[in-house]
């Protein structure tokens, strides 16, 4: 027994590391808690942790990486000799031993690689790959992938294998018995000899009987349905050129060169592989790297039995036997289907064996001759006194009015309608207003008090309106005052009468709005039963009471809102200048010339606009540019008032133009343009000779000046000219000297006007501008002559206008206005132009000062030429040339300059000291000169 026990002890198998035996009396050690445990390395030394929470790496003396100095740069070692021994470092070369351990970030484990895996071919994987290749945009593209990268199983296959799935089995619950062979369909007839009763089916059934019940089998491996989403722009079931069918053919077509050597070729276009070769592109002409071994001879498998040796009739069909031809069906039914449907059938679909029953199409119904596609239902209008006009219109359009069927039916009438037909008086309902409970005397007393208060309010309003009319009569023109009074009367009448012309609370219901208007009319007349009269007798008592409350509430609301608005707003004290609007000054001119230039396609200067724009001073500072108008107070475009375009401006246009209105308009323009004389000339100031206006623009400007209403607050000069206007027209045969004396005493302007015209300020300005343009005069000779001519016209126009203000009108009849206007046009460069002259001797008075002005201009040109010669001679003097000529010409220049200066100073002194009478005498004595 002892031996047996010892043998049994020796046969025991021990697992794990045994504990050290404890000595007698020694207690077992307690486990060390987690916080007291330490980490040691292989040699038993304590390990220090260097991380983010314990100081990180250290490069000092202690605990350094390699040396006392810490990191040291490695010396350069040439790798030319041992270049072949150089190995590429990977991440594992930089890891610690802890990272490569079992609990590290890259533990080492023994794993079976693909090289040592099973060599059996995975059919499921191949079918999936071929399905992917067939549905790809380029079929057969996976052939190149097989050549480049090896195919690997996905995660799904790995999971299935770990769950117990094996290659070649299906996915799903296990079955107990093998599936029996499918029995033939009883509806299908089988021709030929019947099989003997004892066949393989019986033996298979007998084999199944011997199998135990607890044995299960894996389901059959079935290729899953391809649920690939359509993510391309091709049509349904579109496939490009399949290289399997094009190069190698399929089993059901004309012939297949590789059918003998490939037994595994399926519908997916699987290519049979000879000699265990890899999939690849076969070809004799080009080499493709690793596939440059000798290819199979495809012509060695050909036999002459596949070709016809006897001439015979052509086979039915179109003769297209290539791989692109549609498939030919064997039996007649399929050929009929082929004729009916040409194309490829989608995967999962098949042609129907029975045709669809054709739908019977019925002909459309026959329309009558008088049929109209749109039917118009004529309105049914009852014959009452209120809509007699509507009934008449309907009878004229349709021939007769449609009677209301409700009036003849007894079922359509209610009690109120029957009472109305019988002529009975409607029964009054209960009182819904507090006023109806009052007695008759109290109602009359309230009415008298209301009339008294209304009368006092009307008297006070009339007094205030009369006072306002008297105070505003001096400020308003007669037409505007008449319109203002009529507007006040209309406003007072609207306030006194409670008429809601614009206030329609029941606009959606015309009948109700009509009753509400009748209620307001009765209320204005002061009738007591206004509400009861306007209500519809066909309504019920509840509806009548509700409508009575709505009418009273609406009238109260309108009265309160009307009184609130009238108390908050008042009439205007001053008249709005409705006949004029402010527009930019440069836009005031007529744009007819520009439009005509655009029509003629003459683009350029004629279609461009130049505006005078005054920038803000802060803007000039920000952009660091000088202010072009330092003395200007305007910002933006200068604006002037212009008449509104209206038909009424031309209704009161007289045949001949009169002098006072023109003078008043010019004085008005001078008041607007007075403080802006120092500005630069703009397009507004250009003369009409340069603009070349047509007769239409002249007519418009004349109509504006004539249609402008005269203001009462005009200057005294205009009033005096208006008083003397009839004298100029009526007393044309009076003596010339008497008229001159009366006109000079009555309408003599101030001396400022004479100084502005005859002083040398304009000459100085023109001379300074000519000096500035002196260097470029040779290049701009044409423009200088034009400016000189325009300045001559300006001076002549100003002189003639003042002379006409002093000289009386002669006895000869005045010429027409447009001709005179074209002769007296001037350039408005230094302010507004003066009124035109209406006298026959205007041309003479215009030509009188032309000679003197022409002489002054000649003197200016001479002085300018001499100044230019002086500069040239100074240059020659610096070069020390022509000294003798310079000495001879110096006294001549000094004498000529002194004479010109003295003449200018004398002329200035004479013009400053000459009296107005002497000036008139000199103007009369000047000789006339024709140009």
Curated annotation (Swiss-Prot):
There is a cross-link at residue 312 (Glycyl lysine isopeptide (Lys-Gly) (interchain with G-Cter in SUMO2)). Residues 582-593, 669-695 have a biased composition (Basic and acidic residues). InterPro entries: DUF1604, G_patch_dom. Residues 659-668, 786-802 have a biased composition (Polar residues). One of its GO terms (molecular function) is RNA binding. GO terms for biological process: mRNA splicing, via spliceosome. Pfam families: DUF1604 (PF07713), G-patch (PF01585). The modification Phosphoserine is found at residues 6, 8, 357, 477, 715. The modification N-acetylalanine is found at residue 2. Residues 896-905 have a biased composition (Low complexity). PROSITE patterns: G_PATCH. Disulfide bonds: none annotated. The keyword Repeat does not apply. Keywords: Acetylation, Isopeptide bond, Phosphoprotein, Ubl conjugation. Belongs to the GPATCH1 family. PANTHER family: G PATCH DOMAIN-CONTAINING PROTEIN 1 (PTHR13384:SF19). This is G patch domain-containing protein 1. It comes from Homo sapiens (Human). The gene is GPATCH1.
């Amino acid at each position: 027994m002892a031996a047996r026990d010892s043998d049994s002890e020796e046969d025991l198998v021990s697992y794990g590391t045994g504990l050290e035996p404890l000595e007698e009396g020694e207690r077992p050690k307690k486990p060390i808690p987690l916080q007291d445990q330490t980490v040691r390395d292989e040699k038993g030394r304590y390990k220090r942790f260097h991380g983010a929470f314990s100081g990180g790496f250290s490069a000092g003396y202690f605990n350094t990486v390699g040396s006392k100095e810490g990191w040291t740069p490695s010396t350069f070692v040439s790798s030319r000799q041992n270049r072949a021994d150089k190995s590429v470092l990977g991440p594992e070369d930089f890891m610690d031993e802890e990272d490569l351990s079992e609990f590290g970030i890259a533990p080492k484990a023994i794993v079976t690689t693909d090289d040592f895996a099973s060599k059996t071919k995975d059919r499921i994987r191949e079918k999936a790959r071929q399905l992917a290749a067939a549905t790809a945009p380029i079929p057969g593209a996976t052939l190149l992938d097989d050549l480049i990268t090896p195919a690997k199983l996905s995660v799904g296959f790995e999971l299935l294998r770990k769950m117990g799935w094996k290659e070649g089995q299906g996915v799903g619950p296990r079955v107990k018995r093998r599936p029996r062979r499918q029995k033939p369909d009883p509806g299908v007839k089988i021709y030929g000899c019947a099989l003997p009763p004892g066949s393989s089916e019986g033996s298979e059934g007998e084999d199944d009987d011997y199998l135990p019940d607890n044995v299960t089998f894996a389901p059959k491996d079935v290729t899953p349905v391809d649920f690939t989403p359509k993510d391309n722009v091709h049509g349904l079931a579109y496939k490009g050129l399949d290289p399997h069918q094009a190069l190698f053919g399929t089993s059901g077509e004309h012939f297949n060169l590789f059918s003998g050597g490939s037994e595994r070729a399926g519908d997916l276009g699987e290519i049979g592989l000879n000699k265990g070769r890899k999939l690849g592109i076969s070809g004799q002409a080009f080499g493709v790297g690793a596939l440059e071994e000798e290819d199979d001879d495809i012509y060695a498998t050909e036999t002459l039995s596949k070709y016809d040796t006897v001439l015979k009739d052509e086979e039915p069909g179109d003769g297209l036997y290539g791989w692109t031809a549609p498939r030919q069906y064997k039996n007649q039914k399929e050929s009929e289907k082929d004729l009916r449907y040409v194309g490829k059938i989608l995967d999962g679909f098949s042609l129907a064996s029975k045709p669809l029953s054709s739908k019977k199409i019925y002909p459309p119904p026959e329309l009558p001759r008088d049929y109209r596609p749109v039917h118009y239902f004529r309105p049914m209008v009852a014959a009452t006194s209120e809509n007699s006009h509507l009934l008449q219109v309907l009878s004229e359009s349709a021939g007769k009015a449609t009677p209301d069927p409700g009036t003849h039916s007894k079922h359509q009438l209610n009690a109120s309608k029957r009472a109305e037909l019988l002529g009975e008086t409607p029964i009054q309902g209960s009182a819904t207003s507090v006023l109806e409970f009052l007695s008759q005397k109290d109602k009359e007393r309230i009415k008298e008090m209301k009339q008294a208060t209304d009368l006092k309010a009307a008297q006070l309003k009339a007094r205030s309106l009369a006072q306002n009319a008297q105070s505003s009569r001096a400020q308003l023109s007669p037409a505007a005052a008449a319109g203002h009074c009529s507007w006040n009367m209309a406003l007072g009448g609207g306030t006194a009468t409670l008429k809601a012309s614009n206030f329609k609370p029941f606009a959606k219901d015309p009948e109700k709005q009509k009753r509400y208007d009748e209620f307001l009319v009765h209320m204005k007349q002061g009738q007591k039963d206004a509400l009861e009269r306007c209500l519809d007798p066909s309504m019920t008592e509840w509806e009548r009471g509700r409508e009575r409350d709505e009418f009273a509430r609406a009238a109260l609301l309108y009265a309160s809102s009307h009184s609130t608005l009238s108390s908050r707003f008042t009439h205007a004290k001053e008249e709005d200048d409705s006949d004029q609007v402010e527009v930019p000054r440069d836009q005031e001119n007529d744009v007819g010339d520009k439009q005509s230039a655009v029509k003629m396609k003459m683009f350029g200067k004629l279609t461009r606009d130049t505006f005078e724009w005054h920038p803000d001073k802060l803007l000039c500072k920000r952009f660091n540019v000088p202010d072009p108008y330092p003395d200007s107070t305007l910002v933006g475009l200068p604006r002037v008032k212009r008449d509104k375009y209206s038909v009424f401006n031309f209704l009161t246009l007289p045949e001949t133009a009169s002098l006072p209105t023109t003078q008043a308009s010019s004085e008005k323009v001078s008041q607007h343009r007075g403080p802006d004389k120092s500005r630069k000339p703009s397009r507004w100031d250009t003369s009409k000779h340069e603009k070349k206006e047509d007769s239409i623009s002249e007519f418009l400007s004349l109509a504006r000046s004539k249609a402008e209403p005269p203001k009462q607050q005009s200057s005294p000069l205009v009033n005096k000219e208006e008083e003397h206007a009839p004298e100029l027209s009526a007393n044309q045969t009076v003596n010339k000297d008497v008229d001159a004396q009366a006109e000079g005493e009555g309408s003599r302007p101030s001396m400022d006007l004479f100084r502005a015209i005859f002083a040398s300020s304009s000459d100085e300005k023109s001379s300074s501008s000519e000096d500035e343009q002196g260097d470029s005069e040779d290049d701009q000779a044409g423009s200088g002559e034009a400016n000189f001519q325009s300045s001559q016209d300006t001076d002549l126009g100003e002189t003639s206008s003042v002379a006409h203000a002093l000289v009386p009108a002669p006895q000869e009849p005045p010429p027409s206005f447009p001709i005179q206007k074209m002769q007296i046009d001037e350039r408005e460069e230094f302010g507004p132009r003066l009124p035109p002259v209406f006298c026959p001797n205007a041309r003479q008075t215009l030509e009188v000062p032309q000679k003197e002005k022409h002489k002054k201009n000649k003197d200016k040109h001479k002085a300018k030429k001499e100044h230019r010669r002086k500069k040239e001679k100074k240059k020659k003097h610096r070069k020390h040339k022509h000294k003798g000529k310079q000495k001879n010409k110096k006294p001549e220049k000094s004498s000529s300059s002194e004479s010109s200066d003295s003449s200018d100073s004398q002329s200035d002194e004479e013009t400053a000291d000459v009296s107005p009478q002497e000036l008139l005498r000199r103007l009369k004595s000047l000789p006339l000169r024709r140009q």
